């Protein structure tokens, strides 16, 4: 299957999607460069859309917001990868295990990036889009089998990974907003 089919599968049916991702053996670098980074570019470009329906938003504000959003999600991947591999060193003992952890983080972040793109394209702060972020923990929980997390560590891993995936990009975005804007 292609990367985009994997993304669709993991979003629509996480349990099946993680199985498909496991079987597809698409290298993490390819997912990063063919899907994640292009989606981050679309996210950055979507920051210009509010200029069309709100005349008070300037080009420079949109540009800085786009740069901040791009880097907040881009850095989130690497920070979460470092934190998860230090919290759970057994998940990065082999190259295959490291690739699965990378896929787990990437596909979950791709879901969040798609939500942020949708949010930026809507003319108003449409709160139900933010509630869709609560679907991420379900996707993350279903992905624990993909990573072969031991049964006794599933809930702790699920809680830590869900919190990192949800909070870190938002915290970095807030930081960039304070520093840049």
Region spans (language model):
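Generic detector of short alpha-helix boundary/capping microenvironments
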Residues: 1-2, 132
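Selected alpha-helical membrane-embedding segments in polytopic membrane proteins
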Residues: 2-96
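Intrinsically disordered, low-complexity regions enriched in small/polar residues
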Residues: 38, 76, 137, 180-181
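Short, intrinsically disordered/low-complexity patches at protein termini
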Residues: 43, 52-53, 136, 178-181
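Membrane-helix interface and helix-disruption motif detector
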Residues: 56-61, 123-127, 181
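Hydrophobic alpha-helical transmembrane segments and adjacent short intramembrane/lumenal linkers
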Residues: 85-87, 91-170
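Juxtamembrane boundary at the C-terminal end of a transmembrane helix
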Residues: 168-181
């Amino acid at each position: 299957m292609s990367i985009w089919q994997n993304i669709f599968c993991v979003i629509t049916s996480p349990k099946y999607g993680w199985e498909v991702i496991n079987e597809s053996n698409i290298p993490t670098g390819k997912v990063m460069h063919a899907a994640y980074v292009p989606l981050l570019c679309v996210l950055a470009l979507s920051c210009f859309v509010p200029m069309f329906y709100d005349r008070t938003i300037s080009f420079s504000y949109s540009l800085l917001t786009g740069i901040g959003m791009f880097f907040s999600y881009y850095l989130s991947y690497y920070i979460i990868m470092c934190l998860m591999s230090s919290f759970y060193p057994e998940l990065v003992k082999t190259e295959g295990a490291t690739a699965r952890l990378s896929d787990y983080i990437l596909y979950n972040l791709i879901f969040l990036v798609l939500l942020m793109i949708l949010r930026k394209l809507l003319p108003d702060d449409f709160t139900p889009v933010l509630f869709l972020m609560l679907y991420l923990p379900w996707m993350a929980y279903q992905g624990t089998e993909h990573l072969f997390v031991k049964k006794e560590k599933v809930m702790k891993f699920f809680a830590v990974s869900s919190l990192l995936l949800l909070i870190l990009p938002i915290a970095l975005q807030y930081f960039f907003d304070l520093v840049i804007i």
